């Protein structure tokens, strides 16, 4: 999951950084820093962020031909 996918997925899911952090049980600054390119979360924190976004209905698109992105699960 790229920082852009994190931000787009969070917004598409209708979550603020604070809400995502609360559900993922991590500091909101980790999300802010990751989305802005300032920092990189530990692998376990990144996995938890992705898990919460997937729980919220986000699908991560990772395609060599079309690039990466996010979409709402049907």
PLM region spans:
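Mobile acidic interaction elements
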Residues: 3-6, 32, 64
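Recognition helix of helix-turn-helix/homeodomain-like DNA-binding domains
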Residues: 25-41
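DNA major-groove recognition helix of helix-turn-helix/homeodomain DNA-binding modules
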Residues: 44-61
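Short basic helix-loop element that most often maps to the first helix and adjoining turn
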Residues: 4-19
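Residues at secondary-structure transition points
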Residues: 1, 40, 44-47, 65
């Amino acid at each position: 999951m790229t920082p852009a996918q994190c931000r787009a997925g969070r917004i598409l899911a209708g979550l603020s950084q604070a809400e995502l952090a609360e559900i993922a049980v991590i500091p909101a600054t980790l999300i802010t820093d990751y989305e802005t390119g300032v920092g990189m979360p530990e692998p376990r924190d990144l996995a938890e962020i992705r898990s919460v976004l997937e729980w919220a209905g986000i699908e991560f698109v990772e395609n060599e031909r079309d690039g990466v992105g996010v979409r709402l699960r049907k």
